[in-house]
Swiss-Prot record:
The modification Phosphothreonine is found at T15, T42, T91. Most of the protein is composed of disordered regions. Zinc-binding induces structural rearrangement by promoting molten globule state formation. It comes from Mus musculus (Mouse). Keywords: Cell cycle, Cell division, Cytoplasm, Cytoskeleton, Glycoprotein, Golgi apparatus, Hydrolase, Magnesium, Metal-binding, Microtubule, Mitosis, Nucleus, Phosphoprotein, Zinc. This is Tubulin polymerization-promoting protein. The lineage of its organism: Eukaryota, Metazoa, Chordata, Craniata, Vertebrata.
């Protein structure tokens, strides 16, 4: 038998729809959220001139280097290029000893902090007549803003041996005959003795004019 009782109708949702709101208020909220995100983000610290120089030398010659650590070879180059090594108070040996002392036993590189410690060690030797703080500042001035010196550029070398082999005016014998006075090669004439069968004496100024004179006299 069918249920004669009518089921109660569901109550209509009387909650009014949310209004889109004020566009200006929404824009202000987004602006505040953006400012909060920017404040929360950590800004990249600005590098000092000393650390910039450290990174330039740290990546020199190594495409995989990050610039955060420096090998002994680049450490020695930095000390040489920046004139920390003066050959008197600080030598290459001093630089190597300090590097071995500062780096870890199982490490082959030094960090920027260790780099600063190494400079303090060398500063005592480099500027003996200054206080510790002044000596460190002087060493920093030698390095700040510097970059590796690129070597290996080919330069023209002037030596007696090279000049003797390249200056054609100094050639003797058969080699001299291969070039004219300007140094230009004569080609085949400079390599082979060509026989002049014209009948004229070599050096005769009027060579080749006999036929013209005979024909002109007729």
């Amino acid at each position: 038998m069918a249920d004669s009782k009518a089921k109660p109708a569901k109550a209509a949702n009387k909650t009014p729809p949310k209004s889109p709101g004020d566009p200006a208020r929404a824009a202000k909220r987004l602006s505040l959220e953006s400012e909060g995100a920017n404040e929360g983000a950590t800004a990249a610290p600005e590098l000092s001139a000393l650390e910039e120089a450290f990174r330039r030398f740290a990546v020199h010659g190594d495409t995989r280097a990050t610039g955060k650590e420096m090998h002994g070879k680049n450490w020695s180059k930095l000390c040489k290029d920046c004139h920390v090594i003066d050959g008197k108070n600080v030598t290459v040996t001093d630089v190597d000893i300090v590097f071995s002392k500062i780096k870890g036993k199982s490490c082959r590189t030094i960090t920027f902090e260790q780099f600063q410690e190494a400079l303090e060690e060398l500063a005592k030797k480099r500027f003996k007549d200054k206080s510790s703080e002044e000596a460190v500042r002087e060493v920093h001035r030698l390095i700040e803003g510097r970059a590796p010196v690129i070597s290996g550029v080919t330069k023209a070398v002037s030596s007696p041996t090279v000049s003797r082999l390249t200056d054609t005016s100094k050639f003797t014998g058969s080699h001299k005959e291969r070039f004219d006075q300007s140094g230009k090669g004569k080609g085949k004439a400079g390599r082979v003795d060509l026989v002049d069968e014209s009948g004229y004496v070599p050096g005769y100024k009027h060579a080749g004019t006999y036929d013209q004179k005979v024909q002109g006299g007729k």
